[in-house]
Amino acid sequence: MSDGGQGVTRNTRKVREGYVVSDKMDKTIVVSLEDRKKHALYGKVMRRNTKVKAHDEANTAGVGDRVLLMETRPLSASKRWRLVEVVEKAK
């Protein structure tokens, strides 16, 4: 189980930025993440939105805030992201 004194490097975790669309749950926020991808044949940039649940320990984020998320271990049946920081508060 021990690594014999050698440092084991951890893989880099995904970091995404998105907007909070719901904060009604305790210690959980729903964040809309935008993914831009170029169409393979036509070259048009397509936008796709994905909603993910993220862990917000201190309940600091509110609806409309721009937040930074980091991928983490599964925290519940649907939570795999955690809040790193609130980049910009909603007006």
UniProtKB/Swiss-Prot annotation:
Statement: the UniProt record of this protein carries the keyword rRNA-binding: yes
GO molecular function: rRNA binding; structural constituent of ribosome
SUPFAM superfamilies in the cross-refs: Nucleic acid-binding proteins (SSF50249)
InterPro entries in UniProt: NA-bd_OB-fold, Ribosomal_uS17, Ribosomal_uS17_bact/chlr, Ribosomal_uS17_CS
Keywords of this entry: Ribonucleoprotein, Ribosomal protein, RNA-binding, rRNA-binding
GO cellular component, as recorded: cytosolic small ribosomal subunit
Record has Cell inner membrane as a keyword: no
Pfam families xrefs: Ribosomal_S17
Disulfide bonds: none
GO terms of biological process kind: translation
Coiled coil residues, start to end: none
Recorded family membership: Belongs to the universal ribosomal protein uS17 family.
PANTHER family: 40S RIBOSOMAL PROTEIN S11 FAMILY MEMBER, SMALL RIBOSOMAL SUBUNIT PROTEIN US17M
Function: One of the primary rRNA binding proteins, it binds specifically to the 5'-end of 16S ribosomal RNA.
Subunit structure: Part of the 30S ribosomal subunit.
Protein name: Small ribosomal subunit protein uS17
Species this protein is from: Saccharopolyspora erythraea (strain ATCC 11635 / DSM 40517 / JCM 4748 / NBRC 13426 / NCIMB 8594 / NRRL 2338)
Gene: rpsQ
